[in-house]
């Protein structure tokens, strides 16, 4: 069996594809981490973010929303100098703002996991694509998720980023049919 065509020979990318991408994630804090990381890739490749993921975790308190939400402008100033992450002020500020929006949702009785999964009726959607060209970059579900996140104050959550998030967190499974990770193909 082969892997999806977007996977390079980089061992980090292979491990991500084989063990994380498309696997349903139901932990609210992990989903929070992923929506933040997906926003960091805007205009860049995912491998760039993936290679910096451990640095992001260190800089953003393992994506603990309470600790991230408490970060201030001096933290932003420090982080824009940190070569271990993408030094884009707006993206750094977005993570902090997204933590605050996440906490507001939780405080309002809207668990992030339930909110996110509601856009696929709490069931992973399996695409039956045989080639990468058949896989969309956005859908009506990612459009709706993007709109709803923005309404709640999230940033860097356009429809394409939301669709990448949905793929990464297993809301949709876009492994191509011939991929070793397509449902039913794993030993």
Swiss-Prot record:
<keyword id="KW-0378">Hydrolase</keyword>
<keyword id="KW-0479">Metal-binding</keyword>
<dbReference type="Pfam" id="PF03352">
    <property type="entry name" value="Adenine_glyco"/>
</dbReference>
<comment type="function">
    <text>Hydrolysis of the deoxyribose N-glycosidic bond to excise 3-methyladenine from the damaged DNA polymer formed by alkylation lesions.</text>
</comment>
<dbReference type="GO" id="GO:0008725">
    <property type="term" value="F:DNA-3-methyladenine glycosylase activity"/>
</dbReference>
<feature type="binding site">
    <location>
        <position position="17"/>
    </location>
    <ligand>
        <name>Zn(2+)</name>
    </ligand>
</feature>
<dbReference type="InterPro" id="IPR005019">
    <property type="entry name" value="Adenine_glyco"/>
</dbReference>
<dbReference type="GO" id="GO:0006307">
    <property type="term" value="P:DNA alkylation repair"/>
</dbReference>
<dbReference type="GO" id="GO:0006284">
    <property type="term" value="P:base-excision repair"/>
</dbReference>
<dbReference type="InterPro" id="IPR011257">
    <property type="entry name" value="DNA_glycosylase"/>
</dbReference>
<keyword id="KW-0862">Zinc</keyword>
<dbReference type="GO" id="GO:0046872">
    <property type="term" value="F:metal ion binding"/>
</dbReference>
<feature type="binding site">
    <location>
        <position position="4"/>
    </location>
    <ligand>
        <name>Zn(2+)</name>
    </ligand>
</feature>
<feature type="binding site">
    <location>
        <position position="179"/>
    </location>
    <ligand>
        <name>Zn(2+)</name>
    </ligand>
</feature>
<dbReference type="InterPro" id="IPR052891">
    <property type="entry name" value="DNA-3mA_glycosylase"/>
</dbReference>
<protein>
    <recommendedName>
        <fullName>DNA-3-methyladenine glycosylase 1</fullName>
        <ecNumber>3.2.2.20</ecNumber>
    </recommendedName>
</protein>
<dbReference type="InterPro" id="IPR004597">
    <property type="entry name" value="Tag"/>
</dbReference>
<keyword id="KW-0227">DNA damage</keyword>
<feature type="binding site">
    <location>
        <position position="175"/>
    </location>
    <ligand>
        <name>Zn(2+)</name>
    </ligand>
</feature>
<keyword id="KW-0234">DNA repair</keyword>
